[in-house]
């Protein structure tokens, strides 16, 4: 049965502050996490994402603010008394213990009666599909299996929150993709809150109910994977989440409440935005590679599109990825088209002259952060 994200918060971080000597990592940091949610904290190295996780876990002491967990202030509560468990990148399994004993370790530390331990351990192993491995040692398991055991050990205590710190980054690409699906399915089955920290954008988009993007300790955007990808709130988020083309534009006039006429890289066209704009104002028009369209042109053919030439083309199975160099300023544009072998125009030749366009409303329009006009 799929869990339903509940609106009741399981965690509230209120005006949280953490510094190391003179170096402030987060300051006045506020975040509410709902019960049953799969939340990913995403950001580049040094943005503060692991610090936030460690503060929730109790591995770091806050310099200010509050951590509320299921209605209780746990700011000063030691890690071992908080109803959270953490899965680390290194897995941290005990090599001299069997898989069963690794998973049972936390229960024994909590002095759970022996008659309860075996069924709970076997249930946890069953959840990660490794019940038959109970008598093996960690060294006899693959990386993916060790990852699952680390998760089983974390969930056997029935924590209210599971914290995962870059937990899949040590796996190879194929296994990581498999574990992403398994982890999300397990979270649904358990119905507990998962907080996942990663710098991998694709991983965040694949697994999360909600993503927060961090930069220098600040939340740049908080939203669903689709919102983060399709409606980035600023240029940092747009550039950090996947490939994106950023076109320079200048406002000519507002057409109506939804459309603005602008010069976009030499092409006069209407763009959709509700930003308050004035004539001459600089904007950025953002388009994902899959949202850009190409039309092959003869060398002297007239077109209202942005003109460029194919400089690189790569067949990727389902898609053809092309790099277009714009004629007027040599800017490179990435284009991803679904490959159709029956379409004679899909496989472009190098140096082919092309027109670059897009479907109206697919663009994202942001203010030019360097425009001081």
Curated annotation (Swiss-Prot):
It is a peripheral membrane protein. Keywords: ATP-binding, Cell inner membrane, Cell membrane, Membrane, Nucleotide-binding, Translocase, Transport. InterPro entries: AAA+_ATPase, ABC_SmlMolc_Importer, ABC_transporter-like_ATP-bd, ABC_transporter-like_CS, Mo/tungstate-bd_C_term_dom, P-loop_NTPase, PotA-like, PotA_ATP-bd. One of its GO terms (molecular function) is ATP binding. Pfam families: ABC_tran, TOBE_2. SMART domains: AAA (SM00382). It is an enzyme of class 7 (translocase). It comes from the Bacteria. Residues 11-241 form the ABC transporter domain. The complex is composed of two ATP-binding proteins (PotA), two transmembrane proteins (PotB and PotC) and a solute-binding protein (PotD). This is Spermidine/putrescine import ATP-binding protein PotA. The lineage of its organism: Bacteria, Pseudomonadati, Pseudomonadota, Gammaproteobacteria, Pasteurellales. The gene is potA.
